């Protein structure tokens, strides 16, 4: 089975070679755990290191802010967008505001699953995308809880069907044991959970792979850091929670 390299140092070792191609992975965690950074790094490195065009569906943040946040890590996606290798789908602004008018891909009503999927299909075909990030599916559950799981299933079907590999981020509350959204964990191929826990008076970051269809993987909790160049995972270390 073909693997998709994450572009995150140490992560592919934990996944025994990378994410199986066409898998949709749920990346869940509380506030400040690094979900958006992980997702953005997966997409950016996909383009620059593996020549795999990428798309970020922005449901929680303005595209202008996303570009600025990524630039802080040295990830200049403006150039990649101009080259047709990276695309942001604006599903945040509802097409309102002067900045939104300059976006190439806009979902005017993110609650309309058909419009969201149509815009995503167009962008995938336009740039020949191989990687997709949706940040975050939690927004779907907040806006339309009854239809959200169906929308996640539809997105998975479209993304996998078009040969792409994806990360869906999902917000959970501090201390929550689930993965965010009722039943969403059953709609995806893999689950990676990011945590931020206080240990001996200090906040420590860690991640654990709960499931990953198509591959074996580490069952241990591994520490990771967020540096000025992105996330680094330590596959040879294990973090024990008290």
From Swiss-Prot:
It comes from the Archaea. Keywords: ATP-binding, Nucleotide-binding. Pfam families: ATPase. Residues 2-242 form the KaiC domain. GO terms for molecular function: ATP binding. ATP binds at residues 29-36. The keyword Repressor does not apply. InterPro entries: KaiC-like_dom (IPR014774), KaiC_dom (IPR010624), P-loop_NTPase (IPR027417), UPF0273_KaiC-like (IPR022475). The keyword Zinc-finger does not apply. Belongs to the UPF0273 family. NCBIfam families: thermo_KaiC_1. This is UPF0273 protein MJ1359. The lineage of its organism: Archaea, Methanobacteriati, Methanobacteriota, Methanomada group, Methanococci.
């Amino acid at each position: 089975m073909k693997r998709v390299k994450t572009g995150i140092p140490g992560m592919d070792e934990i996944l025994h070679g990378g994410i199986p191609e066409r898998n949709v992975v749920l990346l869940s965690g509380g506030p400040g755990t690094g979900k958006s950074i992980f997702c953005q790094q997966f997409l950016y490195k996909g383009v620059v290191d593996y020549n795999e065009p990428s798309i970020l569906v922005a449901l929680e943040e303005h595209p202008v802010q996303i570009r600025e946040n990524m630039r802080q890590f040295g990830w200049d996606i403006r150039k990649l967008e101009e080259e047709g290798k990276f695309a942001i789908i604006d599903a945040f602004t509802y097409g309102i505001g002067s900045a939104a008018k300059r976006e190439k891909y806009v979902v005017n009503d993110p609650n309309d699953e058909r419009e969201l999927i149509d815009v995503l299909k167009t962008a995938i075909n336009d740039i020949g995308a191989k990687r997709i990030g949706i940040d975050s599916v939690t927004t779907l559950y907040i806006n339309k809880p009854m239809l959200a799981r169906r929308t996640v299933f539809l997105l998975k079907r479209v993304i996998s069907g078009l040969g792409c590999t994806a990360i869906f981020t999902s917000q959970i509350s501090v201390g929550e044991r689930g993965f965010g959204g009722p039943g969403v964990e059953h709609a995806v191929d893999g689950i990676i959970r990011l945590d931020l826990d206080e240990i001996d008076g200090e906040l420590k970051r860690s991640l654990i792979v709960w499931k990953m269809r198509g591959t074996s993987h580490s069952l241990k909790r591994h520490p990771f850091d967020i540096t000025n160049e992105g996330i680094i995972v330590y596959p040879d270390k294990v973090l024990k929670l008290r």
